[in-house]
Amino acid sequence: MSRYDLVERLNGTFRQIEQHLAALTDNLQQHSLLIARVFSLPQVTKEAEHAPLDTIEVTQHLGKEAETLALRHYRHLFIQQQSENRSSKAAVRLPGVLCYQVDNATQLDLENQVQRINQLKTTFEQMVTVESGLPSAARFEWVHRHLPGLITLNAYRTLTLINNPATIRFGWANKHIIKNLSRDEVLSQLKKSLASPRSVPPWTREQWQFKLEREYQDIAALPQQARLKIKRPVKVQPIARIWYKGQQKQVQHACPTPIIALINTDNGAGVPDIGGLENYDADNIQHRFKPQAQPLRLIIPRLHLYVAD
């Protein structure tokens, strides 16, 4: 497929996302809102976009105010829709839930709408990350050449729809991206970097090349069977834990966007019990279960690469 055809599909898919989101928010407002609870988080400024989050103060919103914030959030796709001081790199998150009363017919209609939106979002992300054939550093410029000001994460982020929950509880999750690697795999990656000399601020090209050579030597000095692990921290994430009484099971969802909960009164479902979201404090985390960590030694800090001792 030609680059021109891909751009046409990209723009066409994005227009469909906008249209379907507008239709969904209009449709939701035609339904009876049983309960709504969302939690706004502090604005991340451009100056603080890379700073670790040690505390997060939560503001709760209820009822129609919560619904208005949530429906606007679903359609928040461009930096032009937010304050000039807000970071365009830090994701805008609005955990919470909207609960609507539905019958069998309207439940199916809303399920199909959300499924279609999520399909379009997945297709759009595939075009940018795979079909474009561009490295991650070049994708930003390419997307914004055709869709200026787009917040790509918001365009990718799918909607979560659930049916007839009994209880909904909110909390925070601290995660790491973990990837196990062999010594030879890391050496191969470093070889590729060495073969393409470049400068990486604040280092000159020569300084960066020297840094890579030192890293290569450090990895090459390890035994071939050494166990290496990338353990990169991810910023704390709001989550929702959903309990389904009939199935006697709990399901956990990431909750950067308000969940849409459909309450089917045709089937005798009732309004769920919804909990709050506490302020986040990194110094006061209580772990339900924390397994014994494997002893690790940091070997390449910029890659968050560790070797198991």
From Swiss-Prot:
User: Entry's Pfam families?
Assistant: Ter
Its GO CC terms? cytoplasm
Q: Does the keyword Cytoplasm apply?
A: yes
Q: What is its main location?
A: cytoplasm
Q: Tell me the leader sequence span.
A: none
Listed GO molecular functions? DNA binding
Any GO BP: DNA replication termination
**Keywords attached to this entry:** Cytoplasm, DNA replication, DNA-binding
Q: Which Gene3D superfamilies match?
A: 3.30.54.10, Replication terminator Tus, domain 1 superfamily/Replication terminator Tus (3.50.14.10)
Question: Where does this protein reside within or beyond the cell?
Answer: Cytoplasm
Q: NCBIfam families attached here?
A: rep_term_tus
Which family would the database say this protein is a member of?
Belongs to the Tus family.
**What is this protein's function per UniProt?**
Trans-acting protein required for termination of DNA replication. Binds to DNA replication terminator sequences (terA to terF) to prevent the passage of replication forks. The termination efficiency will be affected by the affinity of this protein for the terminator sequence.
Q: What is this protein called?
A: DNA replication terminus site-binding protein
Starting at the broadest rank, the lineage of the source organism is: Bacteria, Pseudomonadati, Pseudomonadota, Gammaproteobacteria, Enterobacterales
Gene behind this protein: tus
